[in-house]
A protein has these predicted regions:
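Active-site acidic/histidine proton-transfer and metal-coordination neighborhood
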Residues: 73-122
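N-terminal pre-domain/capping segments
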Residues: 1-89, 95
Length: 122
């Protein structure tokens, strides 16, 4: 059975809820993989509380875990440590939200990084 997922916009949650209800869809959270969010426990709490306040079943929703620069196979133990920390934090966020599906990307997403890296090297 195919399912429809939408990425909820926190500044337009009513509209996101309308779509979910109208099309029997689910949320696909992409708030937490950003480094400035996953590094900030207060921001994480704020976002989680916003979603939990909707009082909806989240068990079929999907969460995108941290993936920026995650390298668990690095030769550098410090990189492995921060990668492990980000992965475990993503798991805890999923648990708090009641989400049973957690996606970790491979850190290689074509066209996602290119502009960022090019701008950083200027």
């Amino acid at each position: 059975m195919r399912r429809l997922y939408i990425i909820p916009k926190r500044d337009e949650l009513e509209k996101s809820l309308e779509i979910v209800n109208k099309y029997n869809a689910y949320f696909e959270y992409d708030d937490f993989f950003w480094p400035d969010v996953i590094s900030n426990d207060e921001k994480i709490d704020e976002i989680i509380n916003t979603y939990l306040a909707l009082n909806r079943d989240t068990s079929n929703d999907i969460l995108h875990g941290a993936f920026f620069d995650i390298t668990i196979h690095s030769y550098d133990k410090e990189i492995v440590a921060i990668s492990d920390k980000r992965i475990r934090k993503s798991i805890k966020i999923a648990q708090r939200l009641g989400v049973k599906k957690l996606v970790f990307h491979t850190n290689i997403i074509p066209n996602f990084y290119s502009k960022y890296y090019i701008n950083r090297t200027k």
